Each structure stands twice: as structure tokens, then as C-alpha cells.
Amino acid sequence: MYTDTGLAVRVIPCLDIDAGRVVKGVNFENLRDAGDPVELAAAYDAEGADELTFLDVTASSSGRATMLEVVRHTAEQVFIPLTVGGGVRTVADVDLLLRAGADKVSVNTAAIARPDLLADMATQFGSQCIVLSVDARKVPVGSSPTPSGWEVTTHGGRRGTGIDAVEWAARGADLGVGEILLNSMDADGTKAGFDLAMLRAVRAAVTVPVIASGGAGNVDHFAPAVAAGADAVLAASVFHFRELTIGQVKAAMAAEGNTVR
């Protein structure tokens, strides 16, 4: 059974990085180069972000080498925890990212094909370093239902796996991951709020921290996610396009009685 530890709710901006550049658009007026992940990470750090997540969306091996450089430079300038994910397939991948300066590594598709990978990673590096990223959606009408009604997806939510999302999160926790990054593919990009029902279901199934992702659109969306069981809230475009600041999100959560840093 999960019990709230009373820790501060973490606010986490997420940056998608392709060949060393931030993609999906960023609109920071005070930056010389809003496509530079190191500069953007430093700006979020200064603004009060509790952690940062980098998602490597590069497919090429040259892009992977570039990502390690980005992580190194970021770790030199930013002193909040950094999670890096995207294309992590092996224990060696985790080792390289941690050595480059990542504090945590998130694993997604590779673990679906080989769940024991999570146990191997947690054993070698410690549970606190390993995050299971779950891209989940409601099972489409006409597809075979899963027990919870949500399924794990791959390929940016386009391909269903038939694996129950809540059961998969619980299995990841049993295998030793230290955290679940729960991304609603239904809510992602809608700015209509987080999938609270899915958050509640996963929260009831695991004892490790859960990060809510997908759907943030205004300051009023964050406190309900915490009430539904999120230990941290992650967002991208609302921060990148300056629709919301870290401070505004924290103030809104604090006004609802949540502890923030």
C-alpha cells in the first residue's frame, strides 16, 4: 500500500532533443538560442524547476554520441536531478548516460520486449537511477480489452501492445525500478488536463513514486494530478512557450495545500 511521504511535489520540464537540439518549439525570450538544451536547462534551473527530463528522439548512432555531450555539458551547469531517456536499450546505455552526468535513466520500449532488463539495470545501478516510462492509452473500441482498460503503447502512442498499463507499471516496480513516468497518450498535447483515472489506478498498484505526464494546459491542472496520486508533474509545451512558469505552477499547487520547494 502506498502512503504519501509528505515530500514536496516535484515540477519537471521535459525537453525533446534531436541531434543535440531541442525540438517541438521553445519560446524563451531571454535565451540567445532557444534550441540549445544546455541553455534551456540552465534557464529552467534558475526558474525553480525541481528536476529536468531529456528525451532523446534521435534515431541515429551519431545522435546518441551528441546526446552524451549534451548530458555532459548540462551536468556541468545544472545542479538539479537530470533524467535522460529515449533509445535506452542496454545496461551499457545506462552506464554511458550515468557516467556522462545523468542522475536517472528512463527505459521504455526495450523493457517491453525484455522486462528482465529492468531488474538487471536496477541491480547494477540501484533502483533510484531507473525510471520506467509507460506510454499508455485507453484501449480503443473494438480492440481486446485489458483488465484496467488502459494499454501500453509504442511508437509515440500509435501502436498498441495489448499489455495492461497498470499491470505493467506494477511489474516494473516489482522488478526494481525506482519511479514510474506515466504518460497519457490520450491526453498528450490536448492541454485538457492529466488522465486522473489512470493516475489513480497506477497509484493504487505501486508503492514507488509516480510522475504524471501528458495533458497539462493551465495552472489548475496540476493539483488534481497530485490529489490523484502523482508525486511529480511533468510538462513540456506549456513551459517552453511561456504559457506557464514553474513559479505559477508551484503557487497554484501550494494554494491547494501541496508542499512545493
UniProtKB/Swiss-Prot annotation:
SUPFAM superfamilies recorded: Ribulose-phoshate binding barrel (SSF51366)
Transmembrane annotation, as ranges: none
Molecular function GO terms recorded: imidazoleglycerol-phosphate synthase activity; lyase activity
EC number(s) recorded for this UniProt protein: 4.3.2.10
Predominant cellular place of this UniProt entry's protein: cytoplasm
Residues at the catalytic site: 16, 135
Biological process per Gene Ontology, one example term: L-histidine biosynthetic process
Disulfide bonding pattern of the chain: none
Oligomeric form and interacting partners: Heterodimer of HisH and HisF.
Function according to Swiss-Prot or TrEMBL: IGPS catalyzes the conversion of PRFAR and glutamine to IGP, AICAR and glutamate. The HisF subunit catalyzes the cyclization activity that produces IGP and AICAR from PRFAR using the ammonia provided by the HisH subunit.
Name of the featured protein: Imidazole glycerol phosphate synthase subunit HisF
Lineage, top ranks: Bacteria, Bacillati, Actinomycetota, Actinomycetes, Mycobacteriales
Gene name of the record: hisF
